[in-house]
């Protein structure tokens, strides 16, 4: 132990702070327990399995003692027909078992082993989803081949419906939030586009309708419908009068937790309604002011006519008084002119 510490002391840093930090600890009280790595036993077991016919000899594969030999990976027996199995089935068998990594044999740390296990579980889920989709598409292609050959009997129609339902289920597993809103919509779409004649006459049309139903199920327009219902919900929540009369602070309080697009749309609608109301108010005020001015104009015209009538009456009275004065002046001058010659003959004398 002392020799090992002496050998490792040459690797220590030479800075004074680091040496003081190391000297604070008693390194002799730490015991290092070494366990022998059983690599020879694992290699011998793998050698026996390789001699028996197993093909799993890569260093990253699972330990040979934990996984049973696969019938598809072993040497084919005569007449067994195992060579006809597809590569997809072999890949499915290999991904069905979790890989058990031995960190001592591979030189991994415990953190690397945990990360490898986590990534392995994610890869298994993705591989299972891909296998479900691949199986659904293979069945769907076989159904289209049956339909294009001239007709589709009743049991083939049932298998095609099962394939379509499997594809829809796989798509819903990838998009669960779409499946909840549009499951009934996609089923109704399939029932609506499938022709009633499933026997001999409608092979091509049934294939096209089934493909359209699959496309509709894989690509549901969930966002548009959800957005449309969202708009209807907020349009019902706030009427036009409430949007116009509500203050900005109250509107912001009511719109907490709403999406940014919806807030912008409602505020634009409120601004449009307020501008429309302002324009209507200005138009009403202009019309009202026009009526007031027209009424005042009529009153002024009536007053002008009345004043004209008064002026004409006063002119007639003046003319009448003038004629009367002239008559009085002429008659008085004739009576007093012969008897009294000293009296002034000017008309101002009678006026005084």
From Swiss-Prot:
<dbReference type="GO" id="GO:0005634">
    <property type="term" value="C:nucleus"/>
</dbReference>
<feature type="region of interest" description="Disordered">
    <location>
        <begin position="173"/>
        <end position="234"/>
    </location>
</feature>
<keyword id="KW-0805">Transcription regulation</keyword>
<dbReference type="InterPro" id="IPR008917">
    <property type="entry name" value="TF_DNA-bd_sf"/>
</dbReference>
<dbReference type="GO" id="GO:0003700">
    <property type="term" value="F:DNA-binding transcription factor activity"/>
</dbReference>
<keyword id="KW-0678">Repressor</keyword>
<protein>
    <recommendedName>
        <fullName>Transcription factor Maf</fullName>
    </recommendedName>
</protein>
<feature type="compositionally biased region" description="Basic residues">
    <location>
        <begin position="222"/>
        <end position="232"/>
    </location>
</feature>
<feature type="domain" description="bZIP">
    <location>
        <begin position="265"/>
        <end position="328"/>
    </location>
</feature>
<feature type="compositionally biased region" description="Low complexity">
    <location>
        <begin position="72"/>
        <end position="82"/>
    </location>
</feature>
<feature type="compositionally biased region" description="Low complexity">
    <location>
        <begin position="338"/>
        <end position="352"/>
    </location>
</feature>
<feature type="compositionally biased region" description="Gly residues">
    <location>
        <begin position="195"/>
        <end position="206"/>
    </location>
</feature>
<dbReference type="InterPro" id="IPR013592">
    <property type="entry name" value="Maf_TF_N"/>
</dbReference>
<feature type="region of interest" description="Leucine-zipper">
    <location>
        <begin position="293"/>
        <end position="314"/>
    </location>
</feature>
<keyword id="KW-0238">DNA-binding</keyword>
<keyword id="KW-0010">Activator</keyword>
<dbReference type="InterPro" id="IPR046347">
    <property type="entry name" value="bZIP_sf"/>
</dbReference>
<dbReference type="Pfam" id="PF08383">
    <property type="entry name" value="Maf_N"/>
</dbReference>
<comment type="subunit">
    <text>Homodimer or heterodimer. Binds DNA as a homodimer or a heterodimer.</text>
</comment>
<feature type="region of interest" description="Disordered">
    <location>
        <begin position="331"/>
        <end position="352"/>
    </location>
</feature>
<dbReference type="GO" id="GO:0003677">
    <property type="term" value="F:DNA binding"/>
</dbReference>
<comment type="function">
    <text>Acts as a transcriptional activator or repressor.</text>
</comment>
<dbReference type="InterPro" id="IPR004826">
    <property type="entry name" value="bZIP_Maf"/>
</dbReference>
<dbReference type="Pfam" id="PF03131">
    <property type="entry name" value="bZIP_Maf"/>
</dbReference>
<feature type="region of interest" description="Disordered">
    <location>
        <begin position="57"/>
        <end position="85"/>
    </location>
</feature>
<comment type="similarity">
    <text>Belongs to the bZIP family. Maf subfamily.</text>
</comment>
<feature type="compositionally biased region" description="Basic residues">
    <location>
        <begin position="176"/>
        <end position="187"/>
    </location>
</feature>
<feature type="region of interest" description="Basic motif">
    <location>
        <begin position="265"/>
        <end position="290"/>
    </location>
</feature>
<dbReference type="InterPro" id="IPR004827">
    <property type="entry name" value="bZIP"/>
</dbReference>
<dbReference type="InterPro" id="IPR024874">
    <property type="entry name" value="Transcription_factor_Maf_fam"/>
</dbReference>
<feature type="compositionally biased region" description="Low complexity">
    <location>
        <begin position="207"/>
        <end position="221"/>
    </location>
</feature>
<keyword id="KW-0539">Nucleus</keyword>
<keyword id="KW-0804">Transcription</keyword>
